[in-house]
Amino acid sequence: MYPENQAAGIAANRYGELMCQAAEDLGYDNDICGYARISLAYAAGVRVSRKYDPETGEYIIDPSTGKPLKDADGNVVMGEDGKPKKDPKTQTPYLQLDNLLEIEKLPDGPEKEKRLEAISPIRQMRIPQPDFVLCCNNICNCMTKWYENIARMCNIPLIMIDIPYNNTVEVHDENVKYVRAQFDKAIKQLEELTGKKFDEKKFEQACANANRTAKAWLKVCDFLQYKPAPYSGFDLFNHMADVVTARATVAAGDAFELLAKDLEETVKKGETTTPFPEKYRVMFEGIPCWPKLPALFKPLKTHGVNVTAVVYAPAFGFVYNNIDEMARAYYKAPNSVCIEQGVDWREGICRDNKVDGVLVHYNRSCKPWSGLHG
């Protein structure tokens, strides 16, 4: 499990702020990447838990949550205070933080059972701790210290793949050999840790699946070039979860090929799924703020601004057929390329996708992913 994916899932479920605060309470600065803070808190045993009354055992409902209650005719039911009543079925308990490591030390009994049950049921809060961490620094330097801390906290091995910054457009063979040697060593380390031998045929099949998914994904991204765009760049943000976590599966390839086919039909009909008239087109630079996507989408919608170019999304469309090609591809992550190539990529996507301007999200903890190099 990639800790960054887990952290993004926790953030998207709006638990990120609680987990970040827990990490800061552990001594981690709030200038550190939000993904890292969430992940480090999780490694320390912190879990988001539903608050309950110890006397009754019932969860304490947060009255601010829930959707408006509607009658049989679909009308909103108003309360005596003149405000809409809340549908009890949609209300959720107050949230608090608990520590799984402390819970596991408790003797078996009702308290232990209830505290375990109270931990948030979202899947990202139920993931077991890793047996080892495998780190690569081609997209993020913070990740090096982040994974080192996870390894220290969990007392587990750390396998490191170092990808030097590529200061030329071309990737030289010497650089590929350097990374390939690290992959070969990592394979041996993983064989020792897991007791399993590296299966070349399975790797080739995984590459074939990943390539199929990547090609379909890039085709989906390219449909944003049409005017009007058949969909919004915000849809790409939603689909990214699948291309990041399931790229090497047959199901992901099936899904994105089907999506590409559907978008092709939408373009032929001159239609769009964007729920507003497209007056302006912009490129989005930077990492989306996952729990606040609606807050960004709504004002853009109000002014007819559609995101029709994204730097972040196509970065997951790499194609390679063997370990050498994979090593070369690692040098082509947006944060690993030289400034000339980075500018050229952005100029090309702005031109091809016919944008009127650029919207830049300057993420203070992740400047390279905000288009800032140096």
Where on the chain are the PLM-derived regions?
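Internal, well-ordered alpha/beta segment that forms a basic, Gly-enriched binding/recognition surface
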Residues: 52, 123-223
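Redox- and metal-dependent alpha/beta enzyme cores, enriched for Fe-S-associated oxidoreductases
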Residues: 2-26, 283-347, 351
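Structural motif
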Residues: 135-139, 284-289, 362-363
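Long intrinsically disordered, low-complexity regions that are acidic and Ser/Thr-rich
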Residues: 52, 56-118
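An N-terminal, globular interaction/scaffold subdomain
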Residues: 1-55, 89-92, 96-98, 118-125, ...
